[in-house]
Curated annotation (Swiss-Prot):
Family: Belongs to the acyl carrier protein (ACP) family.
Record bears the keyword Cell membrane: no
This protein's GO CC annotations: cytosol; membrane
Biological role stated in the UniProt entry: Carrier of the growing fatty acid chain in fatty acid biosynthesis.
One GO term (biological process): lipid A biosynthetic process
Protein name according to UniProt: Acyl carrier protein
GO molecular function: acyl binding; acyl carrier activity
Domain Carrier: 10-85
Originating organism: Rickettsia massiliae (strain Mtu5)
Record's comment on post-translational modification: 4'-phosphopantetheine is transferred from CoA to a specific serine of apo-ACP by AcpS. This modification is essential for activity because fatty acids are bound in thioester linkage to the sulfhydryl of the prosthetic group.
Modified residues (O-(pantetheine 4'-phosphoryl)serine): S45
Transmembrane segments: none
Length: 86
């Protein structure tokens, strides 16, 4: 039996992709770390606000509006979370 040990980054990536898929009603298989919320996943401004709020709750962090506007991709979210957790 093989066990895969997931790094913190892998766990964050997996959870963020799950959250994006749920909030944007997309299949997880089409979401990558390079996926852009608006251009690739067809999110609107309300979708992105709701996603940022869900991330804040899930990870116990605050994403000020000026920072939220800089978050364009899944990897941007992962990077932001990791910076706040370290």
């Amino acid at each position: 039996m093989e066990f895969k040990i997931m790094s913190t980054t892998d766990k964050i990536e997996q959870k963020v992709i799950e959250m994006v898929a749920e909030k944007l009603n997309k299949d997880k298989s089409i979401i990558t770390t390079d996926s852009r919320f608006i251009e690739d996943l067809k999110a609107d401004s309300l979708d992105t606000v709701e996603l940022m709020m869900a991330i804040e709750v899930e990870y116990g962090i605050d994403i000020p509006d000026d920072e939220a506007t800089k978050i364009k991709t899944v990897s941007d979210v992962i990077k932001y979370i990791k910076e706040r957790q370290s």
